[in-house]
Amino acid sequence: MAKVQVNNVVVLDNPSPFYNPFQFEITFECIEDLSEDLEWKIIYVGSAESEEYDQVLDSVLVGPVPAGRHMFVFQADAPNPGLIPDADAVGVTVVLITCTYRGQEFIRVGYYVNNEYTETELRENPPVKPDFSKLQRNILASNPRVTRFHINWEENTEKLDDSNPHMHPVLSIEARPSASKGWPMSENSLNVMLESHMDCM
């Protein structure tokens, strides 16, 4: 049984300009004291074509963590535009929140992210070189995809085989505020793209 359960994720400052930091309010519960730190990461998927464009925006160690319910705001700077292919700057991508214990990832929460120009003229005639200062980022906070992995939580034991992750489409999620208009891709296309990054790496 997992010793940590993520109860709630609130997407803050959404929608927002591209260069604003990502902010997530995370609530989790430990069923017993943890002797080592939890490592949380925020990962931005720069391109659906290859994981080489993934950017780890930030990582933070939390712990040792006593039993009980805990909440913190995880903030990370916007991705480096220079590492995002021009063809993937505008449109839908993915941001991931992951957590590991003793180097083993046990949960991954993925959100669709839509980057688009707010000005009508730029939407109709987008520049060849993306202007990130004019882009707005909109996280689809109402539709996260959650994958949980089986790991060994105890000391001095071999790592469990986590090659068969359990996908859960629903987590208690809130947004302040959230919006889902203007998404240019079909739901099937979005699911294929997100699930490709929700597999165990």
From Swiss-Prot:
Q: Which GO terms describe its molecular function?
A: histone binding
Pfam families associated with the record: ASF1_hist_chap
Q: Which SUPFAM superfamilies match?
A: ASF1-like
Q: Record keywords: Transcription regulation included?
A: yes
Where along the sequence do coiled-coil regions lie?
none
- Extract one GO BP annotation from the record: DNA replication-dependent chromatin assembly
Keywords (alphabetical) are: Chaperone, Chromatin regulator, Nucleus, Transcription, Transcription regulation
Disulfide connectivity for this sequence is: none
Acyltransferase as a keyword of this entry, yes or no, is no
Q: What is its main location?
A: nucleus
Gene3D superfamilies named among the record's database cross-references: Histone chaperone ASF1-like
Any idea where this protein resides?
A: Nucleus
What is one GO cellular-component annotation here?
chromatin
Subunit description: Interacts with histone H3 (including both histone H3.1 and H3.3) and histone H4. Interacts with hira and p60.
Q: Which family does it belong to?
A: Belongs to the ASF1 family.
Function, as annotated: Histone chaperone that facilitates histone deposition and histone exchange and removal during nucleosome assembly and disassembly. Not critical for histone deposition during nucleosome assembly.
Matching PANTHER family = ANTI-SILENCING PROTEIN 1, HISTONE CHAPERONE ASF1A
Query: This protein is called what?
Result: Histone chaperone asf1a-A
What organism does this protein naturally occur in?
A: Xenopus laevis
